[in-house]
Amino acid sequence: MQQLNPSEISDIIKQRIEKLDVASEARNEGTVVSVSDGIVKIHGLADAMFGEMIEFPGSIFGMVLNLERDSVGAVVLGDYLQLEEGMTAQCTGRILEVPVGPELIGRVVDPLGVPIDGKGELDTKLTDAVEKVAPGVITRQSVDEPIQTGLKSIDAMVPIGRGQRELIIGDRQIGKSAIAIDTIINQKGKGVTCVYVAIGQKQSTIANVVRKLEEHGAMEHTIVVAAGAADPAPMQFLAAYSGCTMGEYFRDRGEDALIVYDDLSKQAVAYRQVSLLLRRPPGREAYPGDVFYLHSRLLERAARVNADHVEKLTNGEVKGKTGSLTALPIIETQGGDVSAFVPTNVISITDGQIFLETNLFNSGVRPAINAGLSVSRVGGSAQTKIIKKLGGSVRLALAQYRELAAFSQFASDLDEATRKQLEHGQRVTELMKQNQYSPLSVAEMAVSLYAANEGFLDDVEVSKVLDFERALHAYMKSEHAELLDKINQSGGYDDEIQQGLKSGLETFKSTQTW
């Protein structure tokens, strides 16, 4: 061992003293006063900001939601059972952010962006704030491009445009999620990235949805954000905002995205739970006063933005492209009561609603869409030309049928015109039925609607209408593939297409008996 003389030792000590960094680091630190039900009260965080992340020992984080005179109320994002009174809590100076980017596609993540599908870590390069301000009026563009759901009753009667917010509302177990999942499946190959946000659902239900999306090749363009029924209430109410941020990444880069919130009723219940635990005053149905703002600030973020907005956000990398985020929020009603607090709120925020009815579902009309109460306020201008032309008379036929069906229950003898309208309405109602996971192309839909409008179904038995439709689609695909391709590509409706549809249907009817 080398011997050091006393002068060298003193030199080394001097060097170490000179290198010593004694700059003080100011950190705002408080003490946990109480922990209960995922809510933490902290004393001493005078500089805490609303929505700021708070760090506890053991890398547990919370979010500030209450700013009181002598304490701060925060929700714990994770396992609050590890926290105790007297522990320290530190301000981070950051707001909640989640990972964003194309790396998330095909993955299942929790509301904080942590993967929960067992497929390894995420290699995302960017993060973005969960709470963001919606695009202003000047940066928006009118909705004029369709989102094809592949469902006849929606695309023909309640069309949805890119950048629209269309509410799906109805009682439990009548096919609300099925409509949303079919829409996601139908976006395959259409350049639309989908985000499915599951809020407060059973883990088995979420797993089943993911499995179905994988079976139909839809996970290749879908991100699933899952906050199960067993997850803490703060995670359930944050899930929607996290999913929205992930969808906005694509919107702000000139791409199209679709987000499904399944469902916002459970999000409102989770937010009510958090608010009551934070001792905020309850209002109607015990919801807090800002439950309208909870949903409005979320749904206003779904929009179609103009090319200038996209160019500005991408620093000039993307030019001349508009972006869109289309929202399909789902609301569950109790006993068909759409006048409850949360349903009326969301109806007033969205650009229309698809109303599902229990009676229709039980009588075999699936999807169980009530054409009279369902409406799309902006989708008409985004509808494909051929579907707009052929779909108008379908809605009219169904409206007249409902009116006459109610009247005919009391009338014993009906005149010929009324009887014909009733029979036509029965066939159109039957034609609007569609199996789950079997979305139709624009051309297939056009063929079905044309057959209904031009009276080709009038001599077909009501019970055989769907068999007739299946056989017709198979015939048109084999004999008139060019015509179907032309309709799918252009979406137009001219004399040539009309003549092609007419001759195809006439030939089909002449070769087969129904």
Curated annotation (Swiss-Prot):
Keyword annotations of the record: ATP synthesis, ATP-binding, Cell inner membrane, Cell membrane, CF(1), Hydrogen ion transport, Ion transport, Membrane, Nucleotide-binding, Translocase, Transport
EC number(s) on file: 7.1.2.2
GO cellular component terms, semicolon-separated: plasma membrane; proton-transporting ATP synthase complex
GO molecular function: ADP binding; ATP binding; proton-transporting ATP synthase activity, rotational mechanism
Catalytic activity: ATP + H2O + 4 H(+)(in) = ADP + phosphate + 5 H(+)(out)
A Pfam family per the record: ATP-synt_ab
Predominant cellular place of this UniProt entry's protein: membrane
Residue stretches in coiled coil: none
Matching CDD domains: ATP-synt_F1_alpha_C, ATP-synt_F1_alpha_N, F1-ATPase_alpha_CD
Superkingdom, taxonomy of origin: Bacteria
Residues noted as binding ATP in the record, renumbered to the chain: G170, D171, R172, Q173, I174, G175, K176, S177
Site (Required for activity): S374
Function: Produces ATP from ADP in the presence of a proton gradient across the membrane. The alpha chain is a regulatory subunit.
NCBIfam families listed in its UniProt record: atpA (TIGR00962), PRK13343.1 (NF009884)
Database matches in PANTHER family: ATP SYNTHASE SUBUNIT ALPHA, MITOCHONDRIAL (PTHR48082:SF2)
The protein's name in its UniProt record: ATP synthase subunit alpha
Gene source species: Chromohalobacter salexigens (strain ATCC BAA-138 / DSM 3043 / CIP 106854 / NCIMB 13768 / 1H11)
Name of the gene encoding the protein in the UniProt record: atpA
